[in-house]
């Protein structure tokens, strides 16, 4: 299915793909933006849980219950642009610049839980040492 995205919505070098499991309903860009196909609009993102600082988007899930679900934007981006062949090993998604609002595909990488924990601890120690 092709969707004509409004020209004012497009950014240079931005690539769009269907959201995995929501084909034809939602599209995601390499910049971490989510498009609702029905109304051809960029969906708003929000911090559902302020302490985590991750951005979420509310997707309407068409199943037996017909409900909406808050989904992490970085997970949507990675699942759509970089499918995970080894879900047992690479369980976490890391923001390279540590900015959880930067969901550009170039800022995301899959890691094991152990690798991710080590990176985050080193980053926190580095931040603490600067204070």
Q: Which residues does each PLM region occupy?
A:
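Conserved recognition-core residues within compact binding domains
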Residues: 2-93, 97-131
């Amino acid at each position: 299915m092709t969707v004509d995205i409004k020209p004012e919505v497009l950014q240079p070098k931005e690539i769009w793909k269907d959201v995995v499991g929501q084909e034809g309903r939602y599209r995601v860009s390499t910049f971490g933006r989510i498009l609702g196909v029905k109304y051809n609009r960029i969906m708003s993102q929000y911090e559902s849980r302020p302490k985590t600082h991750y951005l979420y988007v509310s997707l309407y899930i068409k199943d037996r219950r017909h409900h909406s679900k808050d989904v992490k934007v970085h997970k949507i981006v990675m699942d759509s642009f970089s499918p995970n062949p080894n879900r047992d090993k690479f369980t976490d998604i890391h923001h390279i610049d540590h900015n959880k609002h930067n969901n550009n595909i170039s800022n995301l990488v899959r890691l094991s839980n152990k690798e991710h924990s080590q990176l985050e601890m080193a980053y926190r120690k580095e931040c603490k040492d600067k204070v």
